Amino acid sequence: MANNVYAYSEIFDSIQGEGEYTGYPTAWLRFYLCNLQCNGFSQDDPTDPSTYKLPYKDFDLIEVNRLEELPVWEYGCDSSYSWSKKFKHLQHRLTSREIADNIRKAFTNEHNKGKWLNRHMCFTGGEPLMKHAQLCTMEVMQHYLNDDDYPKFITYETNGTQMPRPEFIEFWKNYPGELMISCSPKLFTVAGETTKRAIRPEVVARYMEFADRGYLKFVVTGEKRAWEELDVTIEKFREAGVDWPIWIMPSGATVEGQQVHDGDVAKMAFQRGYNVSARVHTYLWGNLIGV
């Protein structure tokens, strides 16, 4: 275990800005690599790749030495730096012990001497349920258990397409804390990912075997076709036995992008009885990486 080295994009301390844990002090580990790209986000027509604007592809990295120096792009995935090969050289590679120690250092300050207390732990990406990330998170959490100081509240922010490994399921069944799965399936009319690739109710149903809690969080625009696809997609999850609550988040990686239709989308959501999530961290600190 000690010799395994894992690639990750970021470790930072902030709050959770989305979903059920919004506002909670949260330690973050963002993994590198994802099986989806979601280049359709914020595009004029997410279903037509020929019309995409993807500024991350043309961005000049010659003077960039750290991921934190990158902008948050208006179009496409807001964390393309955590999966695109273009940014591979900027990723960090450490053992799980080193990662665990760096997470603890991230929330150590004059008010907290490095104890978990009630701090929330969030694994994100990229995709934090890819094989290497499942292995890494088990090792990291085992280090904390061995230290006898471990997070009591944990979330995986996943796209819901990665099957859990048997040892991963067993680990979380026995973990002495609450595991939340924040599952964000990607809609074709919003993210540009095909239903075949992005919507896997049978996979999410497996998450229910070991997660204490969970919810489905969909990024949606104000377009009628997006809501029609949402209705069909939710029904697929319900048919698979996934009865988790529904959260709706207006599309837009930046504050400016969200303000285009966030109020309209929120109203469409609560009128249907769905929960509404904003990206609170962007309203607090702007369009930055590491918050």
Which role does the model predict for each range below?
Residues 84, 128-129:
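Glycine-/small-residue-rich active-site loops that bind phosphorylated ligands and cofactors
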Residues 100, 104, 108-120, 129-291:
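Conserved AdoMet/S-adenosylmethionine-binding subsite of the radical SAM
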Residues 30, 124-125:
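A secondary-structure boundary/capping signal
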